């Protein structure tokens, strides 16, 4: 049996989807263990509020209109705020989980989970415990670029430079079909499904390496 909290847990919410924001507010308020102190549609709105009104716990969507949940985590850590972040996301990629954990998330809950999972994650984090899904430690230490061949690294750099498949084929001396074949292998190794996601991952890793 879960011991009662001495006082209500103060929670803020930030998500780009108004339906999610309203649903989370209703879920938390009806439970009785929580109070909702702020609801925000963007990362900047949340960060501006935290500068003047610190909050104990924030439930943060990963994909925000102006930044990612990872950016929020980085800013909170940089400012040394005592706010504890729970990432609540529909993103299922291992890279998102890896980034969230390495950036200091206290909790990570998929939007496909039952509501009770999120509520118990909030309680655990409020009590000073991490609430993270099981993850192999090798995953956290794994650099997804390490498994790429020289050709795949070359292709990733070309994608980051905005090259089309035709330009890549012309400049590397391989056929367009061969380019497509290498790109499919590249996406599989990176755990992404398209070039936009591959470029975003490439930029994120390079940015982290130069911090």
UniProtKB/Swiss-Prot annotation:
Report the record's Gene Ontology biological process terms: phosphorelay signal transduction system; regulation of DNA-templated transcription
Query: In this protein, which residues make up the domain named HTH luxR-type?
Result: 141-206
- Highest taxon of the source? Bacteria
What Pfam family is a match for this entry? Answer: Response_reg
What's an example of a GO molecular-function annotation for this chain?
DNA binding
Family matches, as InterPro entries: CheY-like_superfamily, Sig_transdc_resp-reg_C-effctor, Sig_transdc_resp-reg_receiver, Tscrpt_reg_LuxR_C, WalR-like, WH-like_DNA-bd_sf
Enumerate the Gene3D superfamilies for this protein: 3.40.50.2300, Winged helix-like DNA-binding domain superfamily/Winged helix DNA-binding domain
Q: Which residues form the Response regulatory domain?
A: 10-126
Tell me which residues bear 4-aspartylphosphate.
15
Q: Which keywords does this chain's UniProt record carry? A: DNA-binding, Phosphoprotein, Transcription, Transcription regulation
Locate the DNA-binding region by residue range: 165-184
Q: What does this protein do, in the record's words?
A: Not known. Could act on the sgaA gene expression.
| Listed PANTHER family | TWO-COMPONENT RESPONSE REGULATOR
Q: Please give the name of this protein.
A: Probable transcriptional regulatory protein SgaR
């Amino acid at each position: 049996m879960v011991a009662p909290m001495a006082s209500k847990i103060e929670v803020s919410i930030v998500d780009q989807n108004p339906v999610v924001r309203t649903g989370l507010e209703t879920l938390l308020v009806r439970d009785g263990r929580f109070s909702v102190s702020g609801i925000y549609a963007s990362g900047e709105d949340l960060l501006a509020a935290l500068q003047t009104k610190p909050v104990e716990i924030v439930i943060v969507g990963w994909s925000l209109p102006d930044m990612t949940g990872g950016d929020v985590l980085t800013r909170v850590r940089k400012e040394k705020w005592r706010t504890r972040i729970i990432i609540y996301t529909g993103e299922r990629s291992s890279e998102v989980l890896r980034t969230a954990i390495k950036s200091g998330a206290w909790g990570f809950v998929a939007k496909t989970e039952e509501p009770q999972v999120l509520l118990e994650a909030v309680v655990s984090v409020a009590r000073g415990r991490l609430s993270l899904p099981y993850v192999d430690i090798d995953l956290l230490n794994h650099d997804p670029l390490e498994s790429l061949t020289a050709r795949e690294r070359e292709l990733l750099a070309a994608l980051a430079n905005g090259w089309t498949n035709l330009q890549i084929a012309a400049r590397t001396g391989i056929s367009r079909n061969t380019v497509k074949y290498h790109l499919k292998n590249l996406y599989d190794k990176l755990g992404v499904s398209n070039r936009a996601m591959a470029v975003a991952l490439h930029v994120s890793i390079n940015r982290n390496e130069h911090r």
